[in-house]
């Protein structure tokens, strides 16, 4: 929780504060459900219309399925910059209403690549690096006798 607070204090936006904020469908869920369409359908039935359903994809073919299935948010995982650019374009043009699918780049994005990823047209960038790679401050207390 402290890492999430630090991100907000630094001007960032947290993806989710808890597991109940939104549904995030990942590869294990897809393996269980059998297809992207089935996973999205089951998630929407389980949580109702007010909870956002997001799905993680790592190919353009999966992206097309996720858009067709009606996912509101798509996490573009471990894609190179050119693929991200194409994916963002599809998210913004292959839907019934432009920009109804929020696309977020994720996976392997550090500060050295951040600007290039931002220029691909994605709506957001997930930087797990901010929270899972931060070093703790070494604080000690010495008593003098």
Regions flagged by a language model, labelled:
Residues 80-84, 95:
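Low-complexity, compositionally biased segments
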Residues 73-81:
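Extended hydrophobic secondary-structure segments
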Residues 141-145:
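A short, gly/pro- and small-residue-rich
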Residues 1-69, 73, 85-90, 101-104, ...:
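Acidic/glycine-rich phosphate/pyrophosphate-binding loops and surrounding catalytic core
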Residues 94-100:
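Intrinsic disorder/low-complexity segments
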Residues 78, 107, 129-130:
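Short secondary-structure boundary segments
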């Amino acid at each position: 929780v402290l890492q999430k607070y630090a991100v907000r204090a630094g001007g960032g936006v947290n993806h989710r504060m808890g597991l109940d904020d939104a549904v995030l469908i990942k590869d294990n869920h897809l393996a269980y459900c059998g297809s992207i369409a089935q996973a999205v359908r089951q998630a929407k039935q389980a949580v109702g219309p007010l909870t956002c359903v997001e799905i993680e994809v790592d190919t353009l073919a999966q992206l097309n399925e996720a858009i067709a299935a009606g996912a509101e948010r798509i996490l573009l995982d471990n894609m190179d910059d050119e693929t991200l650019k194409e994916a963002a374009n599809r998210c913004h043009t292959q839907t019934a209403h432009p920009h109804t699918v929020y696309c977020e780049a994720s996976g392997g994005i550090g500060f050295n690549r951040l600007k290039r990823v931002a220029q691909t047209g994605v709506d957001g960038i997930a930087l797990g690096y901010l929270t899972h790679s931060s070093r703790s401050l070494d604080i000690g207390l010495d008593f003098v006798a």
